[in-house]
Amino acid sequence: MLTKDLSKKILKSDVDVENSVPDEPITMELLKGGSFLKRAIGICKRNLTRMNMIRLMKILRDSWIWVPCRVIMSDTDYAAMEKLVKDAQENGGLDSLVGITLSNQDNIRMIPDILQKGDEFFFPVFSSAEEMCEYGERFSKIEKHFLEAANLARNNEKNVKGIVINAFTEPFVIPSELFEMIAGMPSNFGKNRSV
């Protein structure tokens, strides 16, 4: 049984803890950089209520996230890039490549990574490129709208269970069953800004 003193201590310790995802108007400025999304996810991890989840889904509807991808290029393009790097090493170092624009001969494919936990597969996305930590060093990073990432996850050859946001810091899974619901929510930016 909680005593009156213990109840007061518990309430006092929660004074600075947010328990509700903010219901303020969502703006591009608010979503920029991913910190608002990260904050909303943290609140949902502490206090997963129906209202918090709905507010998070509204935020996701208009959010841009980061997707780790493997770059697949043709043998011709790969050989050209290897030659460029080799020439740079022989003629002053890799710093000489800074600012150089590369043109490819063939199509370059960006293949999103898939994480596996037991028999389940998850599509990883991140609120910012920094949230990828060391994991991100092995991949190219592309910024995508959340709805585009949901389509990539849904159409993946693996049976993806959901999208895991910030998998290596504060992981939060958006189940694949919610993708359609999020896509059906109205954009906070009107028709001109939606995907």
What do the PLM-derived regions correspond to, one by one?
Residues 1-195:
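An interfacial alpha-helical scaffold signature
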